[in-house]
Amino acid sequence: MSVAPHIPVMMSEVLHALEPRSGALYIDGTFGAGGYSRGILSAADCKLIGIDRDPAVQPTATQLVQASGGRFAFAEAPFSAMGEVLASRGIDQVDGIVLDIGVSSMQIDQAERGFSFMRKGPLDMRMAASGPTAADAVNRLKEAELADIFYVYGEERRSRRIAKFICTARAEAKIETTDRLAEIVTRATGGKHSKIHPATKVFQALRIFVNDELGELARALEASERLLAPLGRLVVVTFHSLEDRMVKTFLRSRAGLAGGGGSRYEPAVEAGPAPSFSLLTRRAVSASDEEAAENPRARSAKLRAAIRNEAPAWSDSPSLHTSIVPLARLEAAL
């Protein structure tokens, strides 16, 4: 089937924050359709390693390897494993890292991947080729666990009612397709369509859970701190408030802004060792009105960036993310 072309979000802003330079080495931790990778390679005579855990991107990566004249290499791995990817190549430092967090339009557009309630397909949602599926989650997890996932990862206020409807429905027959889950959620919420489809937040929450997206992001941020050379740049684009909040907390703490940003909704960042980053963006950067009008995915995008200094990476810091329902528990039940 034909799919809509993937448009990299905030390309000019990403390149402005990264400032690619000749002779440098960069990581595109979320290769996807290769938009950022091509942009970086075009901006300077540099080298780049693309990383992605989705095996479906391999043909695109292979094309870029062949066209890059030895300047591009690819590894199929989660971006949290970028340290291992570099170590396998005898590399211990890079000059910049770009991360584009969340599902890509390519994945959403492919019905067989099961990411979208708008396209009938198997209830999968995995970005990698292995691990539990969204169907495994909705058919095996306890009602309270599903409710917690929907509430925390989807910020769905009707989480408990939706979880109850799901458990009632699965007792009659396993929930195996995207359209059936969407129909169950719609019934649970009364079928009211506001600005978004009733199933939007539930699908988002399941995707985040199945792919351990917040855990992956937390580990990738900590790996970036260890891998960036002095004056190396970290650029992160997020599309969800939970992700942006995590990036903001990490960068503010590593920049030594202890106590800053505290409010009744957001706890103040605790003091730590010597700052290891300097902020390039004091506030999140959003896409321009023109880009948001042309590319709907850009509307929720937030970019944050920072520069690494010579201070050692923090070796003992609080975890950025603790899963509300460990994915390992579901894996053990399969």
Curated annotation (Swiss-Prot):
It comes from the Bacteria. GO terms for cellular component: cytoplasm. S-adenosyl-L-methionine binds at G34, G35, Y36, D52, A87, D100, Q107. It catalyses: cytidine(1402) in 16S rRNA + S-adenosyl-L-methionine = N(4)-methylcytidine(1402) in 16S rRNA + S-adenosyl-L-homocysteine + H(+). InterPro entries: RsmH (IPR002903), SAM-dep_MeTrfase_MraW_recog (IPR023397), SAM-dependent_MTases_sf (IPR029063). Gene3D superfamilies: Putative methyltransferase TM0872, insert domain, Vaccinia Virus protein VP39. It is found in: Cytoplasm. Keywords: Cytoplasm, Methyltransferase, rRNA processing, S-adenosyl-L-methionine, Transferase. GO terms for biological process: rRNA base methylation. Its main location: cytoplasm. GO terms for molecular function: rRNA (cytosine-N4-)-methyltransferase activity. The keyword Oxidoreductase does not apply. Its EC number is 2.1.1.199. It is an enzyme of class 2 (transferase). The keyword Endoplasmic reticulum does not apply. Belongs to the methyltransferase superfamily. RsmH family. PANTHER family: 12S RRNA N4-METHYLCYTIDINE METHYLTRANSFERASE (PTHR11265:SF0), S-ADENOSYL-METHYLTRANSFERASE MRAW (PTHR11265). Specifically methylates the N4 position of cytidine in position 1402 (C1402) of 16S rRNA. NCBIfam families: 16S rRNA (cytosine(1402)-N(4))-methyltransferase RsmH (TIGR00006). This is Ribosomal RNA small subunit methyltransferase H. It comes from Maricaulis maris (strain MCS10) (Caulobacter maris). The lineage of its organism: Bacteria, Pseudomonadati, Pseudomonadota, Alphaproteobacteria, Maricaulales. The gene is rsmH.
